[in-house]
């Protein structure tokens, strides 16, 4: 069984513990006897997968989650299905936070990802068009513009997560997940959360 998470930039694949990503218009041919089960938040990229691999199974409708949140993305639902208690932080193009308690989704929120923050600053003024410096000192107030931008971005994200998690265990995933996880003692980085959630659902369905 091959699992696929179709996002807004790449298609992420999972097979026997291995994860890799492919561009939608440069997909490698998979074995015909290996069924592909996928979730998708991008219809255009989904069509790319189906054009080259017509015998795929969309499991979006099977990813159910007990929640009052309206419009929760299927990728976030799948990640939430992987745990019963804790806070899931998916730090990618956007940074999402979802709180799980006894298998119930309590709620969540969305913040810009690091690259989105950088673009927002550059839209304000060319002077603010600076890269986010991950090594900026967060213990002292900055004394220059470049550090001030990085400090403001990172500190706002970190403090928001700390305020949400408090004593709860944190599960980080996504491209910048490993970076943010190092700021928290009660955190682990697991880039397989979405696929673990998919597997849990599929075990009951097939």
UniProtKB/Swiss-Prot annotation:
Cofactor remark: A monovalent cation. Ammonium or potassium.
UniProt-listed SUPFAM superfamilies: Actin-like ATPase domain
The reaction(s) this protein catalyses: (R)-pantothenate + ATP = (R)-4'-phosphopantothenate + ADP + H(+)
Enzyme class name: transferase
Biological process, per Gene Ontology: coenzyme A biosynthetic process
Database matches in CDD domains: ASKHA_NBD_PanK-III
Cofactor: NH4(+); K(+)
UniProt keyword list: ATP-binding, Coenzyme A biosynthesis, Cytoplasm, Kinase, Metal-binding, Nucleotide-binding, Potassium, Transferase
Catalytic site: 75 (proton acceptor)
Protein name as it appears in the record: Type III pantothenate kinase
Naturally occurring in which organism (per UniProt): Helicobacter hepaticus (strain ATCC 51449 / 3B1)
Lineage: Bacteria, Pseudomonadati, Campylobacterota, Epsilonproteobacteria, Campylobacterales
């Amino acid at each position: 069984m091959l699992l696929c998470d179709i996002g807004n930039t790449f298609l992420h694949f999972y097979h026997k513990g291995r994860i890799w990503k492919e561009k939608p218009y440069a997909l490698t041919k998979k074995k015909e006897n290996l069924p592909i089960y996928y979730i998708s938040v991008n219809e255009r990229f989904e069509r790319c997968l189906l054009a080259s691999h017509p015998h795929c199974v969309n499991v979006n409708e099977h990813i159910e989650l007990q929640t009052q949140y309206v419009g929760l993305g299927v990728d976030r639902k799948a990640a939430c299905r992987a745990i019963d208690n804790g806070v899931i932080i998916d730090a990618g193009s956007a940074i999402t936070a979802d709180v799980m308690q006894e298998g119930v989704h309590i709620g969540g929120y969305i913040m810009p990802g690091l690259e989105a923050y950088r673009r927002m600053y550059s839209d304000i003024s060319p002077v603010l068009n600076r890269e986010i410096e991950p090594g900026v000192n967060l213990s002292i107030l900055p004394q220059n513009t470049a550090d001030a931008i990085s400090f403001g971005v990172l500190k706002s994200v970190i403090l928001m997560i700390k305020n949400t998690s408090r004593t709860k265990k944190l599960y980080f995933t996504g491209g910048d997940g490993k970076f943010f996880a190092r700021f928290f003692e009660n955190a682990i980085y697991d880039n397989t959360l979405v696929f673990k959630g998919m597997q849990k659902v599929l075990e009951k369905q097939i």
